[in-house]
Each structure stands twice: as C-alpha cells, then as structure tokens.
C-alpha cells in the first residue's frame, strides 16, 4: 500500500509519516518545506499547489491530508488565507484524485471546531454544527466537499474531526503556552475561567486511529470523531502540567474568553471504537511525555 501524506512536515503529518514508515508502508511525503530533500518527499508551492502532477506520476492507494492552517485567531485576521488552505486546497486535491487516481482513498483532517458550542455532551457526529470562527466554518465546508466528491464522482472520502491534539513536537496551544510562561513569567495567566473543558488526544493515538480508519472505515463521505471520550477542565490539566513540571509559580485565569473558543467539549467516540480504537496514552502519561520532550530541547 502506498500512502501520500500531504503536510508531512507538520505536527500530525510528521508523526503519521514516521508511524507508517515504521510499519514498512510505502510512504510519500508532500509539503511546502524547502530545506529538505529526499526520494520520498515532494516539495509543493505554498501559494499555488499543483497536485495534478503528483497524482499523474504516482500510484497512490491512500491520500492523507494533514495540511492547512490550524489557528482560530489567524482565521479571524485573514479569513481568505484560511479558506484557501483549509477548503480550496481540499477541492484541488480531490480534483486531482478524480482526474488521475479515482480509486485512491482520501482522508482529510477536519476539526472539532465545526461543532462550536454543542447543544449536548457527549458530541455525536450527527450533532448540529455551530462553528464559532472562520476556521471552523472552512473545516465544515471542506467536509461538504468530501461528501460532494463521494456522491457525484464515487471517490472514497472520510473526514476526521480531531479534538484537542497534543504531543511531542507541538510548539503551540495550551501545554507549549504553559511551558513558555513558566520560563518567562513570575505569574502564569491563562485565558478563561479554567472551567472550560476539552477532550484531549495524544498524537500517537491519533495516528493509530488514522490507521484503523484506513483499514475499517466505510469511506462514504462520513465524519468520524477522533478523541478519547474524556472531558478534562483546562484548570485540571494545567495543574497536572504544573505538578509534573515541578514549578512553584502560580496559575491564574483571567476570566476573558478568546474569540472563537468553545466552552465545553467531550466526544462520543462510538464510531471510532467500532473501528477497533482503544486509547493507549492517558492524559497523565501524555503530559509527562511532553514534558520529557520539552526538557530535552
């Protein structure tokens, strides 16, 4: 089986590349990074990516799209750029698949941001979508494009709604933010009340979930929650990080809500479990691994 990973130099993409390589899959990476040369890597233009050449030249069984923008604040500042990277780019990939490799399975990394503030917890895949940002809207639109290409062109597609991803190599979001503030601030201030909650999933569990999707999903344009079905408050995980980081500084919450941030998330992962998913990395183990990685930098 030959897998093309678009965005192979990003956080999830790099982990997925290494994971499938370790299992002796034939893996081809694709990204905009210019200072890397390898026989299994294709550099694409950051401003005008052309996927037709790739799919015309290579026989691909599975295309995993890990590319795109992943910042709610930046999507608010520059919505067209976010749309181009998260929606238009998906259409361009699928159009190339339709033209040259119509039997190729296509997986797109979507986001729990499509849900916004859900009406009930846990969140099922058929919940009403209330995205709170251009980022969430553009991810939702990309999901519709996957449905379009399956319905009208019989392309095998599947959208993965990633919840709160974390793990070694991620230099942004909550745990990296905490690390930077522990280094540079006397008092640690975080947005919100601390009662906001997320469903965290370690990147190692994300890539094993992707593998299960490749093996067992229907690929009929469906969406699948990628999470652990566990709800943790930001206060509790920040304190867990604090404890494991062995730092005496105090954490306070400023009660300010960042635009585009949801309040509470917990996923229903019945669909993912039916594919064979079992969590391997607990939040405690994952945070300790992250701290070990930070300390080795």
Regions found by a protein language model. Give the residues of each.
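N-terminal Rossmann NAD(P)H-binding glycine-rich loop of SDR-like oxidoreductase domains
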Residues: 3-22
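C-terminal "lid/loop" region of Rossmann-like NAD(P)-dependent oxidoreductases
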Residues: 193, 221-224, 232-239, 246-264, ...
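Glycine/proline-rich active-site loop of Rossmann-fold NAD(P)-dependent oxidoreductases
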Residues: 140, 155-156, 165-177, 186, ...
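Conserved C-terminal active-site "lid" loop/helix of NAD(P)H-dependent oxidoreductases
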Residues: 203, 257-285, 289
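Rossmann-fold cofactor-recognition segment
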Residues: 36-48
């Amino acid at each position: 089986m030959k897998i093309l990973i678009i965005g192979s130099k990003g956080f999830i993409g790099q982990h997925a590349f290494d994971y499938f390589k370790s299992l002796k899959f034939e893996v081809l990476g694709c990204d905009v990074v210019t200072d890397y040369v390898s026989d299994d890597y294709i550099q694409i233009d950051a401003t005008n990516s052309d996927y037709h050449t790739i799919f015309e030249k290579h026989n691909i069984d599975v295309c995993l799209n890990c590319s795109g923008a992943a910042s709610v604040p930046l999507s608010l500042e520059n919505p067209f750029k976010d749309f181009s990277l998260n929606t238009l780019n998906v259409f361009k990939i699928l159009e190339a698949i339709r033209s040259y490799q119509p039997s190729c399975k296509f997986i797109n990394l979507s986001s729990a941001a499509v849900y916004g503030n859900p009406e009930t917890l846990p969140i099922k895949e058929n919940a009403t979508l209330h995205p709170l940002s251009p980022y969430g809207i553009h991810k939702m639109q990309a999901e519709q494009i996957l449905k379009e290409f399956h319905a009208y062109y019989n392309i095998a597609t599947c959208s993965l709604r990633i919840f709160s991803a974390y793990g070694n190599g991620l230099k942004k979001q909550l745990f990296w933010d905490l690390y930077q503030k522990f280094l540079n601030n006397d008092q640690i201030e975080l947005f919100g009340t601390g009662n906001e909650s997320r469903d965290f999933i370690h990147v190692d569990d994300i890539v094993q979930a992707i593998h299960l999707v490749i093996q067992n999903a229907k690929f009929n344009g469906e969406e699948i929650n990628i999470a652990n079905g566990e709800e943790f408050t930001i206060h509790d995980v920040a304190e867990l990080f604090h404890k494991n980081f062995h730092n005496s500084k105090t954490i306070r919450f400023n009660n300010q809500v960042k635009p585009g941030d949801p309040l509470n998330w917990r996923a229903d992962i019945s669909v993912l479990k039916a594919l064979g998913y079992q969590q391997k990395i607990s939040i405690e183990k994952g945070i300790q691994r992250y701290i070990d990685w930070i300390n080795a930098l």
